[in-house]
């Protein structure tokens, strides 16, 4: 286990792969069909294989923001924390910036719409804590450190190790306040109804993230929330 780290004694690459691996058998074929049909209503045409690749990508890469230098500097090379109060606060912003600017969907006519959905999904994967409306367009959040969105160093290591897992070769970079401002400003001007479909991608992220984390940190115990998500995705929910 080496940097980048997802948590104490947990590598980020292991967490990325683990979050998707634990979904095996937990998402029904009907759920993928629901995503495909819902997208098609808004002119976003993706066959089932395309939908599955997109779900895999967003689950595997949902914690890209944790590759920020600020977070990684809290750990040694073996993911042992260098201080007791380490934190990944605001890491969802780095993940969102990566998907908004540098994620490249598989061949689809409305690629920008797809990127918007995945961006919202990763930005809201901590939606019990923060939602997009909590962020101000013209300033970083309180106690934000720009090193939190410097992703090139460790994010590139992550992407290199995930080649063959995600759908295509991708790049990541260090992001800036201008990137943050422009992304949030663009979303503040959007009112398209299709944007609500981000929830269809959010559910697999949250299930994979919570399941893998519980296996690593809590000896496999499941919360009631995780059980609800399992039921929704395996039952072909219409979230």
UniProtKB/Swiss-Prot annotation:
Belongs to the CRISPR-associated nuclease Cas3-HD family. It comes from the Archaea. One of its GO terms (biological process) is defense response to virus. This is CRISPR-associated endonuclease Cas3-HD. Optimum pH is 3 and 7-8. Expressed as a fusion protein to increase stability. Its cofactor is Mg(2+). Mg(2+) binds at residues 63, 92. Keywords: Antiviral defense, Endonuclease, Hydrolase, Magnesium, Metal-binding, Nuclease. CRISPR (clustered regularly interspaced short palindromic repeat), is an adaptive immune system that provides protection against mobile genetic elements (viruses, transposable elements and conjugative plasmids). CRISPR clusters contain sequences complementary to antecedent mobile elements and target invading nucleic acids. CRISPR clusters are transcribed and processed into CRISPR RNA (crRNA). Cas3 plus Cascade participate in CRISPR interference, the third stage of CRISPR immunity. Acts as a dsDNA and dsRNA endonuclease (in a fusion with Alicyclus caldarius esterase to increase solubility). The gene is cas3. Residues 5-195 form the HD Cas3-type domain. Optimum temperature is 50 degrees Celsius. Expressed as a fusion protein to increase stability. Coiled coil: none annotated. Proteins of this family have an N-terminal nuclease domain and a C-terminal helicase/ATPase domain. In some CRISPR/Cas systems the domains are swapped, in others they are encoded separately. It is an enzyme of class 3 (hydrolase).
């Amino acid at each position: 286990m080496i940097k980048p780290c997802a948590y104490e004694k947990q590598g980020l690459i292991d967490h990325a792969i683990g979050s998707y691996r634990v979904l095996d058998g937990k998402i029904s074929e009907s759920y993928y069909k629901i995503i495909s049909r819902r997208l098609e209503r808004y002119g976003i045409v993706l066959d089932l294989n395309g939908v599955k690749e997109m779900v895999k990508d967003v689950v595997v890469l949902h914690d890209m923001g944790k590759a920020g230098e600020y977070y990684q500097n809290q750990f040694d090379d073996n993911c042992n924390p260098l201080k007791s109060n380490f934190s990944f606060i605001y890491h969802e912003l780095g993940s969102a910036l990566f998907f908004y600017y540098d994620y490249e969907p598989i061949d689809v006519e409305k690629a920008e719409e797809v990127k918007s959905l995945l961006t919202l999904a990763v930005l809201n994967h901590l939606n019990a804590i923060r939602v997009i409306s909590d962020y101000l367009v013209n300033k970083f959040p309180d106690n934000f450190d720009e090193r939190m969105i410097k992703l090139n160093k460790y994010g590139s290591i992550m992407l290199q190790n995930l080649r063959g897992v995600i759908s295509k070769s991708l790049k990541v970079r260090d992001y800036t306040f201008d990137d943050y401002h422009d992304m949030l400003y663009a979303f503040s001007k959007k009112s398209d109804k299709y944007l609500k479909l981000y929830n269809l991608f959010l559910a697999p992220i949250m299930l994979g993230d919570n399941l893998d984390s519980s296996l690593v940190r809590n000896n496999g115990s499941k919360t009631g929330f995780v059980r609800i998500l399992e039921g929704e995705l395996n039952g072909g929910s219409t979230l």
